């Protein structure tokens, strides 16, 4: 099995993917029809759109720390949450996630990833600005 396909391995795989600049490893954690919520509230769907978002973050060349809060599975669905921190050039951004994963033949994969679920509007504006997005 590839990294991240066991439910408990998803969050460590995200941290490793960011810190090792492994775009392919990050995208491999998502189902083909997965959606991601951006800092400005926009929802993107599909692996190419998710790859583009991760590429933008990786281009910042920062360091990510991920602390898993929970992963609760029932049948073929799971709800997950982590607290992440991303630091680049002395600047720090962080949030709490809301995620849904679905059991696939190849293991657990994200179907919904909301990396900014725990952020207040003011925090989201700052995150969006630091990532080059101003629509919040």
Role assignments for model-derived ranges:
Residues 1-25, 35-136:
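A beta-strand edge to alpha-helix "cap/lid" segment located at domain peripheries
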């Amino acid at each position: 099995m590839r990294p991240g396909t066991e439910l408990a391995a998803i969050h460590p795989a995200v941290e490793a993917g960011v810190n090792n600049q492994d775009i392919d490893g990050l995208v491999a954690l998502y189902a083909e029809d997965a959606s991601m919520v951006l800092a400005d509230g926009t929802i993107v769907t599909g692996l190419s759109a998710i790859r583009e978002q991760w590429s933008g973050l990786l281009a910042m060349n920062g360091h990510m720390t991920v602390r898993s809060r929970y992963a609760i599975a029932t049948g073929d669905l799971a709800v997950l949450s982590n607290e992440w921190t991303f630091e680049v050039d002395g600047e720090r951004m962080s949030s709490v996630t809301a995620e849904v994963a679905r059991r696939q033949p190849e293991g657990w994969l994200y179907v919904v990833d909301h990396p900014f679920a725990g952020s207040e509007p003011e925090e989201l504006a700052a995150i969006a600005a630091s990532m080059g997005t101003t629509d919040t």
